[in-house]
Swiss-Prot record:
General function of this protein: Catalyzes the reversible adenylation of nicotinate mononucleotide (NaMN) to nicotinic acid adenine dinucleotide (NaAD).
Keywords associated with the record: ATP-binding, NAD, Nucleotide-binding, Nucleotidyltransferase, Pyridine nucleotide biosynthesis, Transferase
Protein name: Probable nicotinate-nucleotide adenylyltransferase
InterPro entries: Cyt_trans-like, NadD/NMNAT, Rossmann-like_a/b/a_fold
Source organism per UniProt: Shewanella baltica (strain OS185)
Cited SUPFAM superfamilies: Nucleotidylyl transferase
Family: Belongs to the NadD family.
Keyword field contains Iron-sulfur: no
Coiled coil start-end: none
Gene3D superfamilies reported for this sequence: HUPs
Catalytic function, reaction form: nicotinate beta-D-ribonucleotide + ATP + H(+) = deamido-NAD(+) + diphosphate
Cysteine disulfide links: none
GO molecular function: ATP binding; nicotinate-nucleotide adenylyltransferase activity
Keyword Disulfide bond: no
């Protein structure tokens, strides 16, 4: 089974998370996508909502989307949500499956600042979402890693038959439709009494309004 993993604060979860995940699922023929809320994001400030509230919103979204499931493995943890620890744990639970960890190009460019980043490739492939026509500068230090671990590059240089069994360690660049949406933008709109109906799934907006979340 080919399993995509998209982590995030999801404070709140919105179409800027959901639409790229759907596009990646189709592009790479993934069997399912795990949406994984962080508990204590190491690279971010503490979230505005409780972990339980964010889990509820993500679970609601998953109930509306085919092939999407909530993964609460990080939410249950009392330590920072380091990706390598999570992927190692998921791989031990599903050793026979291929894991595809989804990230944006901005995160990929900061990958060397991540805790034990080299070990990510021991447990999963990386999916790097990029805007149409975007090209990483050839001199950028991450370009060598992107080239060496690119799925297309390895297919060409190692041969398709040899490479098909490889279930971690590759990078899959995927061009996605740009989504000019941020959780900060949504929280600001809600705090002003505006209704960002075009940015959130209806089930998410209903929960936020019913619980009176993000109000000043």
């Amino acid at each position: 089974m080919r399993i995509g993993i998209l982590g995030g604060t999801f404070d709140p979860i919105h179409y800027g998370h959901i639409r790229p995940a759907i596009e990646v699922k189709h592009a790479l023929a993934l069997d399912k996508i795990l949406l994984m809320p962080n508990h204590i994001p190491p690279h971010k400030h503490q979230p505005n909502l409780t972990t339980a509230q964010r889990l509820k919103m993500v679970a609601d979204v998953c109930s509306q989307l085919d092939g999407f499931e909530l993964c609460d493995i990080e939410a249950k943890r009392d330590t920072p949500s380091y990706t390598v620890v999570t992927l190692e744990q998921l791989k031990s639970l599903h050793p026979e499956h291929e894991l595809f960890f989804i990230m944006g190009m901005d995160s990929f460019l900061q990958l060397k600042s991540w805790y034990e980043w080299q070990r990510l490739f021991d447990f999963a492939h990386l999916v790097v979402c990029q805007r149409p026509g975007w090209q990483l500068d050839a001199a950028h230090p991450m370009q060598q890693i992107l080239t060496a671990r690119s799925h297309a590059h390895q297919e060409t240089h190692e041969g398709h038959a040899k490479n098909t069994h490889k279930n971690s360690g590759q990078i899959f660049p995927v061009t996605i439709t740009p989504q000019d949406i941020s959780s900060t933008q949504i929280r600001e709109q809600l705090a002003k009494g505006e209704i960002p109906a075009d940015l959130l799934m209806p089930i998410t907006l209903d929960y936020i309004q019913n619980q009176r979340l993000y109000l000043p």
